[in-house]
Amino acid sequence: MHKNSSAHPAYTIGKLVCFSTLVIGCYSHAATTQTIAQNSMTPSPMLSYPTADAQLGERLYPNEAMYSQQIGVELEKLIRKRDAGGVAQRDVHAKAHGCVKAQLTILDQIPANLKKGIFSRPQSYPAWVRFSNGSHHPERPDKKGDARGMAIKVMNVPGQKLLEDEPQASTQDFILINHPVFFANEPERYLSLMKDINGNLLKKAMIPFALGFKGTKIAFQTTRSKIANPLQTRYWSMVPYQLGLDANRSAVKYSVRPCTAQQDAIPKHPDDNYLRAALKNTLSNGSACMEFLIQPRTSNAMSVEDSMTEWKESDAPFYKVATLQFAPQTFDTTAQNQMCENLSFSPWHALPEHRPLGATNRMRKGIYDHISKVRHEMNVAPRQEP
């Protein structure tokens, strides 16, 4: 049915995975695999595995921390095999449409229960925003169906952060995809998926069985997406986050959408990089605006452990809490593109008020950190927050 196995929806799933999908590592010149091998295959010992917040509905899966470590090993295998002797690319979201400057402005008139963390008072923060395709292929044509990513790094955010090895970082990251739900919940299921992806053709054929019917359906829906302009697309966090601290904490999800309903048409004969061209055209000729939204959970039936089920807006509406303003700019330069690849995004680059929730997010902590370090080491590149 498909001419190319990597275009098959079931295979593309592996390129979407949140544990390294939404993570954005940094790359420079590659070191040899032999040089780095002695430091590989184990997550950072500096990072503790997250505990579960039972009050917000979190629960640890059996052997979750072990599965997390094994998933990190499988993702590292994927990177080392694909990028042996070359520049270590991201395991997924390898193709950026651009890293652009933005201003995140927190609004004054927002519900009192949402005024927590960086949303606690009206203020503006500079930010970097990276738009990307979900695939692990950096040369994959934009016209092919794919997940589309948006990673926001908010700068100059005071306060101690959650990552033990970067507590004084001045950044707060938000990671989003243009689909509201993820395709897997259980750590064991995801590990099975990664082993199938790293296996032979027979193993790859087992991917739909690893995901199950619902997971395969979600993955297919996510990876068939085609868009005209990254700035005219809506994005979701897919997984939940804590908002606030102590007795005032709650579970929420995030979304970012354009300020207007304007939609460009996809070119009749799009070239392979038409999304970068659309981004350049928009910001060369004017500014752009997007809205940052928070969706508070309204019922405990909205599980923080079930990232495969959407919190329906009819039951839990989103509230606008901030705007992202993109001033006219030139971003497609060698220096800025390199800077973009040297950025690393993680949902755990966060204030305690924005702690990630759920199994997907818990596993992301160590996996993102491990894969980021592997890539930096392979590329002999410094690893630090801007």
Where are these predicted regions, by residue range?
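Short stretches within intrinsically disordered, low-complexity N-terminal or propeptide regions
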Residues: 9-12, 32
